[in-house]
């Protein structure tokens, strides 16, 4: 069975899918034909050889290749992809790069040299030097007669105040250009003539800019101790000089903007950084004060020593009172014991003597045996002084023990006082060491803060320069696109003006009554009045013979 019929759109879509998926990256070589550059910037063309023809389109061509306009007969190499234009059922090449014949060999040589020098380390990012912040002398290596040096001088006069510029004249195109530029770089470095160098040249083809792809120039830039800014060609032009230099600028004017900032902007930037630094410092100091507030009473040495001295005095007074109290208490106990012992003995002796008196008075009438007995008893009673002596001997060890106890207690309290004094002295030393440590930490934080602010300042300056460079590039590109679009619209409007046709000898015919344009003989009538407009005025005519007009028409 045969397949069902397909819609034209469905078949075209299948063909489009097959072509665009299988021919997404192609390179075509041929001759341009039917070249048409539209005011929108799109390029429509045909590319052919002796046996075939292929339509093509290059969208936004003018924004990428504004320095050269292609024409019929140019031999080119086109990079792009196949696409199908469904409304016409045609396939075409949609280009994204166009290389003129002869430039392909140079591009191949460019890529080979770039790969080799990259492997040798000539384009390494870590070897690039930073630009000076406010250069006093700016060296410019360029042609002294071109518009480039005028652009640089104009920007510097507007953006900077105190500076010197040293122009080293060289040729920027031709066989000797690379050697002259290399020699200029060597002389500038040997004599230390500038703080920063600008290598500048206007736009051109790859052949015109080839001097800046020479290996001798790349090596001279790499060996330079002075920072170099490359400003060669337009923004879309890249040379090996751009990769080897420390900074690439899209245009010579942008290079002047990069190497020299205006004094007013520098003051504003510094004031902003100063305000930020002061605000950050105040916040940091406030935070540190809050953290150190609990340690304030320890850092006040006078208050600390006063409190410690009061504590020592209180301890000493307490010790003295305690010792005196113990001594007084011991003396009272000793006196009480002595009074008790003495009072009891006297009362007993008094009673006994009275009893003896009674016994002696009765002994006169008793017998000698009783007297002897009584005498024996009297002898016994006379042994009490010996007991007193024994009691005194027994009290002597107690007195010695009491004295020893008091001395030992005093010794212990003195040692305790000495230990407390030692601990307080140790605590004072520890607090003093902590104070020194905190002071050192504060000094370290201050140094870190200073280094951090300097680093932040440098980063902010670099970011500001990058943003400014990008903004200037975007504005310049938009301005150029707007000028090109305005010129194209102006030309288109001028070409559509009907009055321009009248200048070439033509006339416009209008109906006299209705004032409408008459474009056919059929609208004419005999003896009718018509109005004719010429280049420099109008006239009223009467139709006399229509056949003649028809004969002319035929």
From Swiss-Prot:
Pfam families (alphabetical) = Exonuc_VII_L, tRNA_anti_2
Disulfide bridge partners, by residue number: none
Task: Kindly list the biological process annotations in GO that this record carries.
Answer: DNA catabolic process
Predominant localisation class: cytoplasm
Q: Which GO terms label this protein's molecular function in UniProt?
A: exodeoxyribonuclease VII activity; nucleic acid binding
Catalytically driven reaction(s): Exonucleolytic cleavage in either 5'- to 3'- or 3'- to 5'-direction to yield nucleoside 5'-phosphates
Q: Which UniProt keywords apply?
A: Cytoplasm, Exonuclease, Hydrolase, Nuclease
According to its UniProt record, where is this protein located? Answer: Cytoplasm
Q: Which InterPro entries match?
A: Exonuc_VII_L, Exonuc_VII_lsu_C, OB-fold_nuc-bd_dom
Report the EC code(s) recorded for this entry: 3.1.11.6
Which cellular component appears as one GO term in the record? exodeoxyribonuclease VII complex
Family to which this protein belongs:
Belongs to the XseA family.
Q: How does it assemble?
A: Heterooligomer composed of large and small subunits.
Function, as annotated: Bidirectionally degrades single-stranded DNA into large acid-insoluble oligonucleotides, which are then degraded further into small acid-soluble oligonucleotides.
Q: What is this protein called?
A: Exodeoxyribonuclease 7 large subunit
Organism, as annotated? Chlamydia pneumoniae (Chlamydophila pneumoniae)
């Amino acid at each position: 069975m045969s397949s069902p019929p397909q819609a034209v759109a469905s078949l075209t879509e299948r063909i489009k899918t097959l072509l665009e998926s299988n021919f997404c990256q192609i390179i075509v070589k041929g001759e341009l034909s039917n070249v048409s550059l539209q005011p929108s910037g799109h390029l429509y063309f045909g590319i052919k050889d002796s046996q075939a023809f292929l339509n093509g389109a290059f969208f936004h061509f003018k924004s990428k290749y504004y320095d050269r306009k292609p024409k019929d007969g140019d031999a080119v190499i086109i990079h792009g992809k196949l696409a199908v234009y469904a409304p016409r059922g045609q396939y075409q090449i949609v280009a994204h790069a166009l290389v003129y014949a002869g430039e392909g060999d140079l591009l191949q040589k460019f890529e080979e040299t770039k790969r080799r020098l990259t492997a040798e380390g000539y384009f390494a990012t870590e070897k690039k030097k930073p630009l000076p912040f406010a250069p006093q002398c700016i060296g410019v290596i360029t042609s002294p007669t071109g518009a480039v040096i005028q652009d640089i001088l104009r920007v510097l006069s507007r953006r900077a105040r105190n500076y010197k510029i040293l122009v080293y004249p060289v040729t920027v195109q031709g066989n000797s250009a690379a050697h002259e530029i290399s020699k200029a770089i060597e002389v500038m470095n040997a004599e230390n003539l500038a703080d920063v160098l600008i290598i500048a040249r206007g736009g051109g083809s790859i052949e015109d800019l080839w001097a800046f792809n020479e290996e001798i120039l790349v090596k001279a830039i790499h060996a330079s101790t002075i920072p170099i800014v490359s400003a060669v060609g337009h923004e879309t032009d890249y040379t090996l000089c751009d990769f080897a230099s420390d900074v690439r600028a899209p245009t010579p004017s942008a290079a002047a903007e990069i190497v020299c900032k205006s004094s007013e902007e520098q003051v504003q930037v510094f004031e902003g950084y100063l305000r930020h630094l002061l605000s950050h410092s105040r916040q940091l100091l406030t935070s540190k004060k809050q953290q150190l507030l609990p340690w304030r009473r320890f850092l006040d040495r006078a208050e600390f020593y006063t409190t410690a001295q009061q504590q020592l005095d209180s301890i000493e007074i307490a010790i003295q009172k305690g010792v005196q109290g113990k001594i007084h208490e011991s003396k009272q106990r000793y006196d009480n014991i002595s009074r008790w012992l003495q009072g009891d003995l006297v009362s007993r002796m008094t009673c006994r003597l009275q009893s003896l008196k009674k016994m002696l008075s009765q002994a006169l009438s008793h017998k000698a045996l009783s007297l002897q007995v009584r005498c024996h008893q009297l002898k016994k009673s006379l042994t009490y002084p010996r007991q007193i002596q024994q009691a005194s001997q027994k009290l002597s060890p107690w007195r010695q023990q009491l004295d020893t106890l008091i001395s030992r207690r005093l010794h212990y309290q003195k040692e305790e006082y000495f230990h407390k004094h030692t601990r307080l002295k140790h605590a004072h030393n520890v607090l003093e060491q902590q104070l020194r440590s905190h002071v050192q930490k504060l000094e370290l934080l201050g140094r870190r803060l200073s280094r951090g602010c300097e680093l932040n300042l440098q980063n902010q300056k670099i970011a500001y320069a990058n943003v400014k460079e990008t903004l200037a590039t975007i504005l310049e590109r938009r301005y150029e696109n707007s000028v090109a679009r305005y010129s194209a619209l102006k030309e288109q409007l001028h070409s559509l003006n009907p009055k321009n046709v009248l200048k070439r000898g033509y006339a416009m015919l209008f109906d006299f009554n209705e004032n409408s344009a008459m474009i056919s003989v059929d609208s004419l009538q005999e003896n009718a009045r018509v109005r004719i407009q010429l280049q420099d005025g109008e006239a009223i005519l009467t139709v006399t013979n229509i056949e003649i007009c028809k004969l002319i028409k035929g």
